[in-house]
Amino acid sequence: RSISDPNPFLISNIRGTFTLLETVKTTKKRFIQISTDEVYGSLKDQSADESFRFNPSSPYAATKAAAEHLVNSYVLTYDCDCIITRCTNNYGPRQFPEKLIPKTILLAKQNKKIPVYGDGKNIRDWLFVDDHCDAILQALLNGKTGESYNISAGNEVDNLTIVNKILSIMDKPSDLIEFVEDRPGHD
């Protein structure tokens, strides 16, 4: 969505973070910035630790990186108690329907073609939403001011494998898969 219309992401991720930080500056409450591993960009065969250089490849990822820099500036300038978490791909109940897993399920139920970007070999680490929430709570309770924490599940699977597993579970044919041109900014 950020590729076709980045403005809402600029407003929520940068302006929204600024608004929250201004409140934190006066209340001195702990603030946790929920970010994304997308700030690192395409890692190919590498993994990133928290000190890895940012290289966002989409407007969404760039706004999350900008928000992180804003958070860090409030830690240094105003002595705010802030921490940052960067998670991998979440999945679970009430996920946006345009995301890979729910979209695949919805289209397969309707026996419609399922678009898979490129060759489908983009690897993602899949993190169940409840596990992500547990990790956020641990970071909030135990994290150090000014630190960033990567959150992953160690469950790396390429997109094509995910789609094929869903089709198999649903007893649907693999010819529902339609390979489409990779979208710009896809990491």
Identify the residue ranges that each predicted region occupies.
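Gly/Ser/Thr-rich beta-alpha loop segments that engage phosphate groups in nucleotides
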Residues: F18, L43, T63, R94, ...
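Residue-level signal for the nucleotide or nucleotide-sugar donor/cofactor binding architecture
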Residues: S4, S12-R15, S51, S58, ...
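N-terminal Rossmann-like NAD(P)+-binding domain of SDR-like oxidoreductases, especially those catalyzing
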Residues: R1-N90, S168
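Conserved helix-to-beta-strand junction in the class I
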Residues: T23, T27, L107, N142
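Short, glycine/charged-enriched secondary-structure capping and boundary segments
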Residues: I3-P8, D45-D49, P97-I105, D130-D131, ...
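Active-site phosphate/pyrophosphate-handling residues
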Residues: R15-T19, A66-H69, K99, K103, ...
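Active-site proximal helix/loop that lines the substrate pocket
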Residues: R1, T36-V39, N89-Q95, K121, ...
